[in-house]
Amino acid sequence: MSTSTVIRPVARSLLQLRKAGNTPPAFLLPCLQSSSTTSSCTQSTSFSTSSTHLYPRDMNRLRGVSTQRRTGPRQPLSVSNAKLPQPVLDESKRLKVKVDENHGLYEFFRHKDKALSTPAEEGSHGRPWSAEELRGKSWEDLHSLWWICCKERNRIATESYERQRLEAGYGDEDAEKRDMTVRRTQRAIKQVLTERYYSWQEAEVIAKDDPEIDFSGEGPLYTPRDFEEEFEEDVLAEAEGEAEPKPAQVTA
């Protein structure tokens, strides 16, 4: 039976070629036989021993929820039966809220009557403070100047955001120059404070060997010796003056 199953496809192919008038030579019979047998034994499905990496179910909890198709949420939501407030369209019935003209939030804007500055106003600014000028300032002056710079940078950022939102198309270059000027002033303030900190550290090392300075915390921190000696001499002189006997008064 096995021989007949192999010969039948070969004979069928030979008969078809003979009907067509083309008889193949004898040495091509093994080729015809192998092609016919392999075609009948071809594997139709793929085979793999590796495990699949696909999950048996979808882990997306929002699968099927779409705002464009208005499918709604997959779980019920709690909605109250309260009525929504209606807007007051009549301006005469609206409440007039009084706003403080000197409110602190106005400090974030350069102008109260307009949102953006003109290019001329944005470009009109002075030069930054130098470290030489700031070395003679007090701690309070440096602290105030630092927060003025912070407020100015906040104003610049607010106007830059507003220009980007409105697509004004101007003022970006002037705002960058103005911001760089403020940043240079802040850099000079940091330099002066760093110099003062290093000077304080060096003075603390020198003060440890100074007899007039006491770091123990039990008494005053600074006690000048010359003033103490002069004070002791004055006290002794006053005590000696009080101890001298007074001359006797002669009465008639």
Swiss-Prot record:
Pfam families per the UniProt record, alphabetical: MRP-L47
Alphabetized UniProt keyword annotations: Mitochondrion, Ribonucleoprotein, Ribosomal protein, Transit peptide
Gene Ontology BP terms: mitochondrial translation
Localization, UniProt: Mitochondrion
GO cellular component: mitochondrial large ribosomal subunit
Domain of life: Eukaryota
Alphabetized GO MF terms: structural constituent of ribosome
Compositional bias ranges of the Acidic residues kind: 233-242
InterPro entries: MRP-L47_sf, Ribosomal_uL29_mit
Organelle transit peptide residues: 1-39
The UniProt record lists the keyword Mitochondrion: yes
Region (Disordered): 233-252
Oligomeric and partner information: Component of the mitochondrial large ribosomal subunit. Mature mitochondrial ribosomes consist of a small (37S) and a large (54S) subunit. The 37S subunit contains at least 33 different proteins and 1 molecule of RNA (15S). The 54S subunit contains at least 45 different proteins and 1 molecule of RNA (21S).
Family of this protein: Belongs to the universal ribosomal protein uL29 family.
Full protein name: Large ribosomal subunit protein uL29m
Species whose genome carries this gene: Botryotinia fuckeliana (strain B05.10) (Noble rot fungus)
Originating gene: mrpl4
